[in-house]
């Protein structure tokens, strides 16, 4: 576990988190989504931000998430936790739920937090936060990332 966390901090580009935190202040509507294990990170970040007065939308039901994405406007920031990248890939969940079509037509700014390098190539994803993982102990890495995002948000709020 220690090796995984050390690897994360030594190889992670924090400037991507700085952009995300900036956008938390910029956008009036924020949604944070994920499914399965990635939903844990989404929920944790949402709870932390709400505790500091930043209201964020989050749905556990995947279809509710897709409906939100489909109707999001340009004043909306969507953060998707998907360690595998399947949430946003054309060959992933899109086969069944048309996520590709919804994301491609969305007017929202979309961030994806993932370990999948291929997500960077998707034109309908505006920003990618790549998470370095060494041994697939991503639950620990996910917690470190959520804590880092929240600490940077707190730090900017206090200034």
Identify the role of each PLM range.
Residues 25-158:
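Glycine-rich phosphate-binding loops that contact phosphosugars or nucleotide phosphates
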Residues 11, 23-26:
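Membrane-interface junctions
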Residues 1-16:
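HTH-adjacent hinge/linker in prokaryotic transcriptional regulators
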Residues 16, 21, 157-159:
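Active-site phosphate/pyrophosphate-binding segments
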């Amino acid at each position: 576990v220690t090796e995984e966390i050390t690897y994360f901090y030594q190889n992670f580009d924090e400037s991507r988190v700085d952009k995300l935190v900036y956008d938390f202040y910029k956008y009036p509507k924020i949604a944070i989504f994920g499914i399965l294990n990635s939903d844990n990170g989404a929920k944790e970040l949402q709870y932390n931000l709400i505790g500091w007065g930043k209201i964020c939308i989050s749905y556990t039901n995947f279809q509710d998430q897709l409906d939100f994405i489909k109707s999001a406007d340009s004043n909306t920031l969507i953060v998707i936790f998907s360690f595998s990248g399947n949430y946003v890939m054309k060959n992933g969940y899109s086969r069944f739920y048309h996520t590709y079509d919804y994301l491609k037509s969305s007017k929202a700014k979309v961030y994806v937090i993932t370990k999948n390098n291929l997500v960077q190539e998707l034109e309908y994803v505006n920003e990618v936060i790549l998470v370095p993982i060494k041994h697939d102990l991503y639950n620990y890495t996910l917690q470190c990332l959520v804590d880092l995002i929240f600490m940077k948000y707190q730090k900017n709020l206090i200034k």
